């Protein structure tokens, strides 16, 4: 290997070669350990496995379910998020996706299936009908599935696009990564800590207010 030295500016005060800088050499063993050993908390590792291996339980009630199934095609490839394994039994699933209109007669069935799911479990409400009843403001339609089961992520739209469903999966993965659950038996008041996730509306509020040049419909 050839080494070359560069002089300092000859017009300067010092015409000597520059002195070499002293560098701290790290231990080679420490470098190899950092490359081959995963450092972290057990809770974070468990959450990492949970959020990347979600098993959804498809509970399609209306047209929103068609958009959900579309996300499983090769065009969208929901397998990138580890949520392509649909389960026909709630006992083998940890995510319930309520897609469509929830009627009053269907609410007890959804409640029973949700109770049959083992912990940890999450719920995604997909579409305007599942969120708030949609345009069916009548006695036979439940005005939102959150009236009888807890909902983690809401997907707006009538019906929402497959991209919206995949964004909901990413938001759910982010929420799962911040959860804190007991790793053993639950004693006393120990429960599940869920981070207070900011809604997309609030998160994008500042960005939308800052917009000055609005695009025409032809430019969108």
Curated annotation (Swiss-Prot):
Entry's localization field: Cell inner membrane
Cofactor: [4Fe-4S] cluster
Lineage of the species this protein comes from: Bacteria, Pseudomonadati, Pseudomonadota, Gammaproteobacteria, Enterobacterales
Membrane topology: Peripheral membrane protein
Reactions it catalyzes: a quinone + NADH + 5 H(+)(in) = a quinol + NAD(+) + 4 H(+)(out)
This protein's encoding gene: nuoB
Pfam families: Oxidored_q6
Protein name, per record: NADH-quinone oxidoreductase subunit B
UniProt keyword Transcription, yes or no: no
């Amino acid at each position: 290997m050839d080494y070359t030295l560069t002089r300092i500016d000859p017009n300067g005060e010092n015409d000597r070669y520059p002195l070499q800088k002293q560098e701290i050499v790290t231990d080679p063993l420490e470098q190899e350990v950092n490359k081959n050993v995963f450092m972290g908390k057990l809770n974070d590792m468990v959450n990492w496995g949970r959020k990347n291996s979600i098993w959804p339980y498809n509970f399609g009630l209306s047209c929103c379910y068609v958009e959900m199934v579309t996300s499983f095609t090769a065009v969208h490839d929901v397998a990138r998020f580890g949520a392509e394994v649909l389960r026909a039994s709630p006992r083998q699933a940890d995510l319930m996706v309520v897609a469509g209109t929830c009627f009053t007669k269907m609410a007890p069935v959804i409640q029973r299936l949700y109770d049959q799911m083992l912990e940890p479990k999450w719920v995604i409400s997909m579409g305007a009908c599942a969120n708030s009843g949609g345009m069916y403001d009548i006695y036979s339609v439940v005005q939102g599935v959150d009236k009888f089961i807890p909902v983690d992520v809401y997907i707006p739209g009538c019906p929402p696009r497959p991209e919206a469903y995949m964004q909901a999966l990413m938001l759910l993965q982010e929420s799962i990564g911040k959860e804190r659950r007991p790793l053993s038996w639950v004693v006393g008041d120990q429960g599940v800590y869920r981070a207070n996730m900011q809604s997309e509306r609030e998160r994008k509020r500042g960005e939308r207010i800052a917009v000055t040049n609005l695009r025409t419909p032809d430019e969108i």
